Amino acid sequence: MNFFKILSFFSLFVITCFAKLDLNSKTDADGVIQITGRLFHRIVNGKQDFTTVALFSADSSTMNCDVCRLIEPEFKALANSYKLKYGLDSGIRFTYADFGKNKNLFQDFSIESVPNFWIFKPKSIQAIHVDLSHGVTASHLAAIVEKHTGKIADIVYKQDQAKRVGAFLSYIIVGAALFFTRKIIVKIFTSRKVWAALTIITVITLSSGYMFTRIRFSPYSQRGEHGENLWLAGSQQFQFGAEVQVVSLLYTALTMSSIFLAIVAPKVEGAKRQTLFVIIWLAFLWIGYSFLVDIFKRKVSMYPFKLLI
């Protein structure tokens, strides 16, 4: 009789050990079990002697889920941190289910949105739903796991050695490039022409209303009452994105005209050619200002000035 009892206990011990080994073998390097429907029902069956932390998510590239993209590396860091501190026999199992591979499992739990972070306590199939609106960082998730299990682990993020080596090599290449081209770089950054061009571009960009539209999130254009496409807002208090582009183009044309008249015209050889050059760019300048003044008049009906238009 004692022999059969001993044999029964030994058989139970062997089965338990094999069950643990089987579960451990399905754990990846991060300490996460990539589950399918059948495997999850084997893990959470109401008889488990461990806590199951489950993340139900979806591939962010196919589902366009920004939160999924953020939480997945944090969940891996969470599982890896517990694995480093407690090993695989910590009494906590971290499982991950992807929607694309577990549609039936998602239907079984009536999951209609992702991600979902659930905790199943030992001997229970009732999930504890965790609200993710307060954050999805590994530290925040670890605090939740500690609350329900009493175990905590300091979060340790894995260092991607390939990225570190790549970054180091990039720094070396950039440093070498800067060293061998230092004379050219110095000439560029000490050139008056370069700084003049940068200054002109900055002034035109800011004075055309670019920052105004960026701060107010102005639309590019707008439909009028009769379905026409309006690119010019009839008010000084508002501006469309298309209007910024038109005004910037006008400012650029006027600036180039002024530069040609001030710098290039005196260097033109021959009195007749120089006179013709000046007349052409003066006409261009006059026409450009006419369009600019017309825009001012359209935005403010009481604007008193007018040129050609």
From Swiss-Prot:
Q: Where in the cell is it found?
A: Endoplasmic reticulum membrane
> What CDD domains does its record include?
TRX_family (cd02947)
Q: Which Pfam families match?
A: OST3_OST6
Any single GO CC term annotated in Swiss-Prot or TrEMBL for this entry: oligosaccharyltransferase complex
Q: In which pathway does it act?
A: Protein modification; protein glycosylation
**Gene3D superfamilies named in the record:** Glutaredoxin (3.40.30.10)
Which residues are the signal sequence here?
Answer: 1-19
Q: Which family does it belong to?
A: Belongs to the OST3/OST6 family.
What protein name does the entry list? Dolichyl-diphosphooligosaccharide--protein glycosyltransferase subunit 3
